[in-house]
Amino acid sequence: MTAAVGLVSVTRRIGARPVVDDVTLEVRERELLTLVGPSGCGKSTLLRLIAGLERPSSGTITLGGLDVTDVAPERRRIGLVFQEHALFPHLTVGRNVAFGLRRLDRRRRAERIEEMLELVRLTGATRRYPHELSGGEQQRVALARALAPDPAAVLLDEPFANLDASLRDELRADVVAALRNRGATALLVTHDRDEALALGDRVAVMRDGAIVQVDRPEVVWSAPNDEFVAGFLGPMSLLPSGDGQFQIVRPHQFELVIGGDGRVVEREFRGAVWRHTIVRADGTQLIVDAEPGRDLEVGATCAATVRPGHLPAQLTRR
């Protein structure tokens, strides 16, 4: 199957430094691929390369199997959604959504505007202006505008980063629903590991300009390629299991036992659980979650064992 978006050996250098380093990646038709990594790893630059806002130093970019490496941004049929909304403040919501619909006649344009606003749950907002909308509503308009021309792909760069937590969760669900309902192909950039795992059909993890793992969320979580991926996706403890192998044990996979060679040096309330930092006699540090009532105070001696039925991932430490 031809990839909706394809990159082959794409590199972008600034001076001698590769900001994007030999990236080969594909986004499949109707797939939502999340691209996650720490700040400054090259995620947004990769998005800009796909959109045509920057040119690669080397490599090939395709859309629907067609080479667009040297094609101007406006001819790539790409929808863009940024974290700062980028709406035209002097235009109404309807005219913002209509911006990429100039080839449609007036009747079809009006129908498409209403269709897109219904899709993002903003029916009736056609004549309002951006300054009259909340941050979440502005982001919905930005998505409607990106989807309106039926783009080959939608690129979303940290679209929820400027929103408070409750609004972010609600908008996240609505945006994903709109993309699914439209059958859109999408690449969503985020530095939020929980967001990447929750939203993506597949997750691509980026570090220092390179893609270090691409797979389904549950595979990336449970079978990380290396220690960086394992640690970036969530807190963990590394336990030696022999022959240079280590077990990756997540906090919820441990069970606390009173008494032993460990000592609780720190604990933090996380709502559903208390998170403990435990240091063993040999200096090994463990991160262990326990439900309220099963938690231990700082200074308590304890041991931590892997819960029955939990199979920690294996990792060769490099």
Model-derived features: positions:
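ABC ATPase nucleotide-binding domains
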Residues: 32, 73-79, 83, 87-225
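Conserved ABC transporter NBD signature motif
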Residues: 59-67
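The feature captures the beta-strand-to-loop junction immediately N-terminal to the Walker
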Residues: 36-38
